């Protein structure tokens, strides 16, 4: 019995390959990087969104960065990706791993990312803002559920995700899979 494997991730192509390895990446029938805004079949790019953040959004995020009391900053706080951006108070720069555990604890105690997401949703209602990974927010004009259009109603889909609660970046796709195509599995580790 053979199943086709698809990978859906909030990360860009380079980070995805770093995370899963080139062998696994290439074994997937299709990889939906950047929540489906940058799509590859093997080495071939088949789609890339041209969405870009507004100056107003970038200014808002810089204000949030200034407002945060979290003491560790590693740089690269606004990472531009095809079809979206990732925003992180900690940052994605050198030394990111050193502060990651501290930020996770901080965010659990303060709900900082949830609060920033709420303010973003209030100020930019046309955007999709999701808590992604351990330290970031994924911001774009669409979410992971956009990939559902690549599947037929008779396809049986099994979706495994780790951020499947409402407001997290796997939630929209998990909801769409449950409604249309198959089963979801919440992965804890």
Question: Where on the chain are the PLM-derived regions?
Answer:
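Acidic, Mg2+-coordinating phosphoryl-transfer loop and its flanking beta/alpha structural elements
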Residues: 9, 87, 148, 154-189
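Short glycine/serine/threonine-biased micro-segments
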Residues: 8, 34, 130-131, 159
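Residues at the C-termini of beta-strands that transition into short coil/loop
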Residues: 32-35, 133, 188
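Short beta->alpha linker loops
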Residues: 11-12, 82, 143, 188-189
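Active-site phosphate-binding/coordination module
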Residues: 1-77
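Conserved acidic, metal-coordinating active-site core of Asp-based
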Residues: 71-158, 166
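A generic structural motif
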Residues: 2-4, 125-129, 155, 179-183
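Alpha-helix C-terminal capping segments
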Residues: 1-3, 20-24, 64, 119-124, ...
């Amino acid at each position: 019995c053979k199943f086709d494997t698809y990978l859906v991730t909030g990360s860009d192509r380079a980070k995805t390959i770093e995370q899963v390895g080139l062998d696994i990446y290439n074994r997937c029938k299709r990889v939906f990087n950047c929540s489906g805004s940058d799509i590859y079949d093997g080495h071939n790019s088949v789609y890339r969104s041209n969405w870009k953040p507004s100056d107003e959004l970038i200014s808002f995020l810089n204000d949030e960065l200034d407002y945060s009391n979290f003491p560790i900053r590693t740089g690269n706080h606004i990472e531009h990706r095809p079809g979206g951006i990732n925003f992180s108070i900690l940052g994605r720069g050198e030394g990111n791993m050193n502060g990651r555990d501290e930020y996770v604890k901080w965010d659990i105690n303060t709900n900082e990312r949830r609060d920033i997401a709420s303010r973003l949703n209030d100020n930019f209602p046309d955007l999709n803002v999701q808590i992604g990974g351990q330290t970031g927010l994924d911001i774009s004009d669409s979410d992971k559920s956009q990939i559902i259009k690549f599947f037929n109603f008779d396809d049986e889909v099994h979706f495994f995700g780790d951020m499947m609660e409402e407001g997290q970046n796997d939630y929209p796709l998990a909801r769409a899979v449950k409604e249309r195509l198959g089963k979801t599995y919440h992965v804890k580790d």
